[in-house]
């Protein structure tokens, strides 16, 4: 596959659990089939939305194998495989590759707050260890530090398999710098559903979306409308979805989206600690919006 396929609508896939918190493999297969039918371009299991901090390495490999088996060659599988220990991040990436991942999403090192050179060396080691595309995940709100645009662009220029960035900094200046100065092989994706419309209008390549768990066809359509220059229809669709985008973060992700999927009959509402079920007042608000959108009756 080419690096140019790191584009379009990518779903940050939830991990369904049974009541005993084991992985619900049947539900996982159903989710993949849902995305096959909905036009999703990329499946991203084992990321933040997939509760990756609570998954052991064997579980991550099993999830990736199932997702790849179910997706076949129809949808790219780009697995979450990152941590703040560079040696461990390389190990996770290699294991994801062995399990069937065709690309990996590697979160910026968190908590230990490396320098910009530390970020560069972290991703250099990952890129040199792999023969598949690497997507940098820059999410300062969770990691506590930002990978500067200059560092991301340096990595993209130095390593052909550093293929994309999931940019979730909410920094418009940084996004514009990445879009303006990136090499030809490098894709820039937003990690914010609320920014899909303006981001794509600025020349972005796609989104890694939480809401695509619930409304994958609509997320794909929103991207397509902007790419086709149909901004009036894109605005109408975005306005229809924007409350859902907001409510998906009324509590910590992925709690709201998993509750929504349980109401839609796709998974059980089960989380692993320290995540807990939503407060009843928030459940009521989200349920009303799902009814308004026609996702449940």
From Swiss-Prot:
Pyruvate binds at residues 49, 208. One of its GO terms (biological process) is lysine biosynthetic process via diaminopimelate. Its main location: cytoplasm. GO terms for cellular component: cytosol. It comes from the Bacteria. Homotetramer; dimer of dimers. NCBIfam families: dapA (TIGR00674). Belongs to the DapA family. This is 4-hydroxy-tetrahydrodipicolinate synthase. It comes from Prosthecochloris aestuarii (strain DSM 271 / SK 413). The lineage of its organism: Bacteria, Pseudomonadati, Chlorobiota, Chlorobiia, Chlorobiales.
């Amino acid at each position: 596959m080419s690096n140019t396929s790191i584009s379009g609508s990518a779903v940050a896939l939830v991990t369904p659990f049974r009541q005993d918190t084991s992985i619900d493999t049947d539900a996982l297969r159903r989710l993949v089939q849902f995305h096959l039918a909905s036009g999703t371009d990329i499946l991203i299991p084992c990321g933040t939305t997939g509760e990756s901090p609570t998954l052991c390495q064997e579980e991550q490999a099993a999830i990736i194998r199932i997702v790849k088996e179910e997706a076949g060659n129809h949808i790219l599988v780009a697995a979450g495989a990152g941590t703040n220990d560079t040696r461990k991040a390389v190990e996770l990436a290699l294991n994801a590759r062995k399990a069937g991942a065709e690309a990996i999403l590697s979160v910026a090192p968190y908590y230990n707050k490396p320098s910009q050179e530390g970020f560069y060396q972290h991703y250099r080691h990952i890129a040199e260890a792999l023969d598949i595309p690497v997507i940098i995940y820059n999410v300062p709100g969770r990691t506590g530090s930002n990978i500067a645009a200059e560092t991301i662009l340096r990595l993209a220029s130095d390593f052909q398999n550093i293929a994309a960035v999931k940019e979730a900094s909410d920094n418009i200046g940084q996004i514009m710098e990445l879009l303006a100065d990136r090499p030809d092989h490098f894709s820039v994706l937003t990690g914010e559903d609320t920014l899909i419309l303006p981001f794509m209008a600025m020349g972005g390549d796609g989104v890694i979306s939480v809401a695509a768990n619930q409304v994958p066809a609509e997320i794909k359509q929103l991207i397509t409308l902007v790419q086709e220059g149909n901004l009036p229809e894109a605005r109408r669709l975005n306005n229809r979805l924007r409350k859902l985008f907001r409510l998906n973060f009324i509590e910590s992700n992925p709690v709201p989206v998993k509750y929504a999927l349980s109401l839609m009959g796709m998974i059980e509402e089960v989380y692993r600690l320290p995540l807990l079920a939503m407060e009843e007042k928030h459940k009521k608000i989200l349920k009303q919006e799902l009814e308004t959108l026609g996702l449940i009756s």
